[in-house]
Amino acid sequence: LTPFTHAVTEHDLMRYESVRRSPVLFQERLDKKLELRVTVVGDQVFAAEIHSADDPKQSVDWRRYPSFDLARFYASHELPFEEKHRCIRLVQELGQCFGAIDLVLHPERGYIFLEINPNGQWGWIEQFTGLPIAEAFANLLVRLSTNYSSARE
């Protein structure tokens, strides 16, 4: 067992019986132009490209072999309006005001959802892309505290 994603091997399939009653996630192996970490803060969406497809070692799970050329590996990304709206709607449907969403941009199929994390990491995105995520959080907290104070009066 590993905390990282890896391609399923014949050996893994032989061991499947030992984890048959455990939660296990399998996912289709996807061709990808790039991966995206989308951070939703309130009604703001910040998307960062992760250029994992450029390196065969990182193509399955970029977290396993972090890149040392970080300026080239991460970049901000402008999501189409409909994709931004879907991300905001998902976070709202889950009753949250924040979510870290992982997407893949497939060459033919477009944006493909992988997962959402209600407590995902975002500091590294701001550090390497300059996206103002901390500022968005600060503004959201001020807005929420103002609404809370008004409701109590």
Give the label of every model feature segment:
Residues 1-78:
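Phosphate-binding site of ATP-dependent enzymes
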Residues 25, 46, 99, 112-114:
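Protein kinase-like catalytic core scaffold
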Residues 32, 97-98:
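Residues that act as N-cap/strand-start positions at coil-to-secondary-structure junctions
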Residues 40-42, 103-107:
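Short, low-complexity Ser/Thr-rich regulatory SLiMs
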Residues 68, 74-81, 85, 89-96, ...:
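C-terminal active-site "lid" helix and adjoining low-complexity regulatory extension at the edge
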